[in-house]
Design a protein with these regions (language model features):
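Charged, low-complexity intrinsically disordered terminal segments
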Residues: 1-193
Length: 193
């Protein structure tokens, strides 16, 4: 509720708000949640609808969008593992909840997210727009605000890589292996699967 309220408030201020959600991953989310956003002027796109008739001939239950990506004004990208539901957004130190009259510990999950600023944000912006286009989302106002000119930030090298069900090049895997092979002091890796 708090998240949708914030999106609607920003939309009310004239901010363009576009949301892609995975159909299968959001089965437990009430349809009213997305309808309320649509009614408030948010552009909402269902990724690969679970209904094969609605999805069309290329439907596959395993063709999912697992990205968690927040883009702000083409200048900031926040990405990682957090989802928009209680277990994920509550954190691992969440207070107990009451269920069926009993006090139970909240099953919070450990999540990792990063914030990126600088030219690499354009790569993440392009990944979002490519997905929007492939999923046949409504036309967006693709003004210059999507890709502002950004100067370098920091000293790290950041590259936006994406994959989808049609990818056959294993670019993410190849890049991870290459990065690990080039390590000289340490490797830190977090991956859920």
């Amino acid at each position: 509720q708090e998240f949708s309220d914030l999106l609607l408030a920003k939309r009310g201020e004239g901010v363009e708000v576009n949301l892609i959600y995975d159909s299968f991953g959001s089965l437990a989310t009430p349809r009213e949640f997305f309808q309320r956003l649509k009614d408030g002027g948010v552009n909402v796109l269902e990724f690969n609808p679970v209904d094969p008739i609605q999805a069309g001939r290329r439907w596959s239950i395993n063709h999912r969008d697992h990205r968690k990506l927040l883009l702000i004004d083409g200048r900031v990208a926040i990405l990682g593992s957090i989802n928009l539901y209680d277990n994920s957004s509550s954190g691992s130190q969440a207070p107990p909840r009451t269920r069926a009259g009993r006090l139970e510990p909240a099953p919070g999950w450990r999540e990792t997210n990063i914030m990126i600023e600088g030219p690499a944000v354009a790569g993440f912006q392009q990944l979002f727009l490519d997905t929007w286009t492939r999923q046949k989302g409504p036309a967006l106002n693709r003004g210059s605000g999507y890709f502002p000119v950004l100067g370098p930030r920091g000293h790290d090298i950041v590259l936006a890589l994406g994959s989808n069900a049609d990818s056959r090049d294993h670019l993410i895997y190849i890049t991870l292996v290459s990065a690990i092979k080039s390590a000289e002091a340490y490797v830190h890796l977090t991956n859920a699967y």
